Amino acid sequence: MAAKKISKKEIIHYYDSTEVDYKLIWDLNKSYAMHFGYWDKKVKNFPQSLQRENEILAEKVKIKNSDIVLDAGCGVGGSAIFLAKKFGCKVIGITLSKRQADKATNNAKQKGVAHLAEFRVMDFEKMTFPDKAFDVIWAIESICHADSKKRFIEEAYRILRKGGRLVIADAFLTKENVTADEEIILNKFLFGWGVNYLETVKNFNKYLRTTGFRTITFTDVTNNVMPSSKRLYRFSIPAMYIGKFAEFFKMRTKTQNGNIIAAHYQHKALVRGLGKYGIFYAEKSSAIS
């Protein structure tokens, strides 16, 4: 699948202009979350699934009160605020969007954790943090936007301390070579959400290993996000028709309608097995010099 070059400015524009959609159907004003969510026996409704994904990742990476955590691609602060409130740890969230960073800062103030959670505008492929600055790097559905997944992994390794932990929840390709029909589905899914390309699990694992990470695990949780995927798909069916009408009368933009189209085709991609949703965990050795 050929990668399309989507600029950082286009990614910022996507998130800033589609915030209204996340507010309408994704509980953004209450959850501060923009991720799929995680469904298991503990989850009874959609808002709970959003919170549950934070809990699952926190368990996976074993967050402690003493940790300094980087939320790479923090959105409006949902995960960082969750970690600060639940564990009392220090969290720095970074995002390309100043609008998101400002909203995240305000959200942290409203939740009483501004002393623990701070937010900055920064590109996670070119971070300005010093070496060995963090105990944990956390990324939910953000590394998909990286121009180079390998470059992010190298940066993550650089800024992690000895024994530091990395946890990533995201979508991954199941194969590198796709048919023309499959490529159409993937393009509508990815480009509508401001994503250049997805990496395969095999390649992502290789980048982690060759960079120096150890104790690498990947957990396929596609079934746990499928209820949210179906929810998006159901919303997208009427929304695509309404969106075309609204765009004709300049009530919605092409980017906003691309968001709806992506919501439709993400489910088709998962159902056809073109992609999977999973959680990577890796550690930086505590024995390195």
Regions found by a protein language model. Name each.
Residues F172-V195, L208:
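Short, glycine-/aromatic-enriched active-site segment of Class I SAM-dependent methyltransferases
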Residues N196-G212:
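Short alpha-helix
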